């Protein structure tokens, strides 16, 4: 079995109209992305939370998946009519062959070496180093497989600085990778928090796959004092380490919350921050922490700091 793939470029103003016309004509799927992707002309479509939303690309590349017997001439003419041209000036047509898509997807994910003693290993691979710590993690609904620089930065920091007996809050836990790693590195208790229920589901699945002790690892969508469960509330005593790998704007807004979650003298680790955003985040957190840039990778930074002594006002 095979399909046809039709690719062409149009102005972004026509994307919705063209997409509707293609689906009406029997398209199986319509994929739209920035025609300048990967070049100096690439334009962001969405900013991070708190950023302006009026960011759009000017040229869109559209890829349509069609049945093998689709009437290509009729479909191309329909697109040309929508954009007001007698014909599409340029397009590419290709055949898409049936493949083992699961195996093809799995082949894209190899074990990732984070440090001399830590690997992130998909479930369909054998651990490359039986003597090392292997986090069993499959790509899924939540962010965090170890492939992104910000995740690697956080894992490397935890590997170097977490001490047995530490207590950890992973704020914005995603897949649970940082929380699970903290437990494997010897943390006494770990709490992973995320506002996305899908992230909690993924984290719980990954915790089970890594044989984590449920009495030492808690995942929740709500921060105390909203959590009324006694066990959850007990786990939310101030911790010795807070790690948050999210984005710069949410981190800025969350600074007072994360400050209260730490014991005096506790350490905070922040990532998901571009080098160009580091100074702004440092300025905000310096009100409560002795902050510095701890590491950089591919334009991303890891900020780390220690909380001053005193109360939790």
Curated annotation (Swiss-Prot):
It comes from the Bacteria. Pfam families: PrmA (PF06325). Its EC number is 2.1.1.-. It catalyses: L-lysyl-[protein] + 3 S-adenosyl-L-methionine = N(6),N(6),N(6)-trimethyl-L-lysyl-[protein] + 3 S-adenosyl-L-homocysteine + 3 H(+). The keyword S-adenosyl-L-methionine applies. Disulfide bonds: none annotated. InterPro entries: Ribosomal_L11_MeTrfase_PrmA (IPR050078), Ribosomal_PrmA_MeTrfase (IPR004498), SAM-dependent_MTases_sf (IPR029063). S-adenosyl-L-methionine binds at residues 151, 172, 194, 245. Keywords: Cytoplasm, Methyltransferase, S-adenosyl-L-methionine, Transferase. Its main location: cytoplasm. One of its GO terms (molecular function) is protein-lysine N-methyltransferase activity. It is found in: Cytoplasm. One of its GO terms (biological process) is methylation. GO terms for cellular component: cytosol. Belongs to the methyltransferase superfamily. PrmA family. PANTHER family: ELECTRON TRANSFER FLAVOPROTEIN BETA SUBUNIT LYSINE METHYLTRANSFERASE. This is Ribosomal protein L11 methyltransferase. It comes from Nitrosomonas europaea (strain ATCC 19718 / CIP 103999 / KCTC 2705 / NBRC 14298).
